[in-house]
Amino acid sequence: MSIPKIVHFLWMSKEKDEKTLQCLASWKKHLVGYEIREWNSETFPYNDFIWTKEATEAKKWAFVTDYFRLWVLYNYGGIYMDADVLLQKNFDGLLDCNFFAGTEFTQQIGAHCMGSVAGHPYVKRCLDFYENRSFKTVMDNKALQEYAIPRIMTYILSIDYNVKTIRNFNNEPLKIDDGILIYSDNLFTIDICDNKNVGIHLGLGSWRDSTTFANPVYMENLEWYFIKRYYQHELQNMFSNRLKRMLYMISPIFLIVLYFKYKSRIKNIPTIMNVKNLIIKK
C-alpha cells in the first residue's frame, strides 16, 4: 500500500492571515499532482464528537484540529498538515509506507505533518483517546499543555509498538511495525541546511499560553532563523554543509539556543507516567 496524494487541512475560523496564505501558496507550488482538500465547519462534523464540539465552542481551534487530523487520516488517508507549515519540497519519496511522521526536538511525534493510509491501527488508537473525553473539563482544569497531541501520540507509540525512544536516527527513519516510519525533525519541523527539509513548521499555533509554558516550536524556529541568517546566502555556497554546521556549533548563538532548548524540554517533554494517567482518566 501507499499513501494517497491527498493533503488535508482544517480552517475553522474566518479570514486567513498573510503568513498562512504564504504557507498555502507554497503547497500549491510544490504539490503539483496532489489534491489539496480544505475542510471547514460545514464539511467536518465537529458537533458529532464531544471533544471537538466543546473545543469549537471555546474557539480553541488547534484542539479541534487535534481530533480532526486523526479523524481525517483514519477515514480518508492522505497527508495532514497544519496550515502553518511552509513547504520546500513535495512528498513523492515518502509515500511508500503506511504511516509517516516527523519529530519535534522534545523527542515527541510532530503531529503538524503526517501521512497515513486509511484505517491505520496506530491512528485509530490515537483517535480512540478522545472518545467521550470532555475538552471543557480539560480546559477548566488548566491542563491544555498535558493534552497536547504530540504527548498522546508519542505515548501510544511507545506502548503499542514498544518504542523506547525516538532519537538517534543515524540519517535513517525509524522503521516500526505496521509500516510506520518516523523521521528526524530536520524533515518536517526545521531546516538545518542539509538539503533534506520538506517543510518548516512556523509554529503560529494559537493554543499556547506563553505566560505558563515555553513554546518548543518557537525555539526550533529560533534556531532555524539564526542558521539561515548567520550564514548569508553567498557564504552558504562557499562552504560544505558539514563546515557550516561546525561553525554554527562553536558560535555563541548555538550556546544561547541550547540553553533555551533545555528550558523548553524540561517544561514540555512528557513522562510515561503522567501521560498514562491522562489516558486512563476521562
Q: Where in this protein do the model-derived segments appear?
A:
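Glycosyltransferase-associated regions of secretory-pathway enzymes
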Residues: 1-65, 83-282
